[in-house]
Amino acid sequence: MVSIVVEASNGFCSIACLENNKVLSQRNMECSNNLSAIILQEIDNCLNDAGKSKKDLTEIIASNGPGSYTAIRVVAAICKTLAYTLKLPLKVASSLKLQALLEFESNKLIVPLIDARRNNVFAAVYKVENKKLIEVLQEDYYSLEELNNFLKNNDEQFVYVGRDIKKLKEKLLLAENNKNEVSAANVVKIYDSLEIVDSYNMKPQYLRKTEAERELENDKNK
């Protein structure tokens, strides 16, 4: 079983090639402004690093959000196209869950988050039990106040993960050190929980409507 894993939900792209759930290669890079221009080449580069090619692939694994709308759409389009043209199964993984896996060995609550602007975040809270991620607070679109109140009212220690923590640190509760950059290779830790989706109908998990959709609704309600 040879897999390519693609994650690029928040200005950072991570691509990994796995064989029988073991990491053969991984490429990580900033991609805030050029994801669509580099992603196909970087997938090829990752496969080359692993000594593989597209014809060796047996499945595609895509991070399907939440995060940057543009990045999520690009990853979805590329992975759906690869799965369809190569006639391969497509699996999806939550970008927040992939972030949480950076602290998979932690005995604290794990709080992955992505800045959603205007004092809001995409976030979830997990804990690890029996080497499995257990959802304590479901992934969703929260105000920072809502997330902070949840953590305040919980007696357990916690740790944040995510590259937006520095930007939001003055608005977050005190927590211990955090890890920032998501790793596509970490999908091996939740591989058995991934489900195959219909590559034609696979939809990114935005968790909220785009600004254009919100403006259109506002115009209709005027």
Where are these regions (language model features)?
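DPxDG-like acidic metal-binding loop motif
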Residues: 59-95
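Gly/Ser/Thr-rich beta-alpha loop segments that engage phosphate groups in nucleotides
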Residues: 13, 65-69, 73, 117, ...
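N-terminal beta-alpha supersecondary unit
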Residues: 1-64
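Surface "functional belts" at beta-alpha junctions
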Residues: 22, 89-182, 211-213
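Acyltransferase
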Residues: 175-222
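Residues at secondary-structure transition points
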Residues: 30-38, 69-73, 77, 178-182
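Conserved hydrophobic/aromatic positions in well-ordered beta-strands
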Residues: 16, 124-126, 205
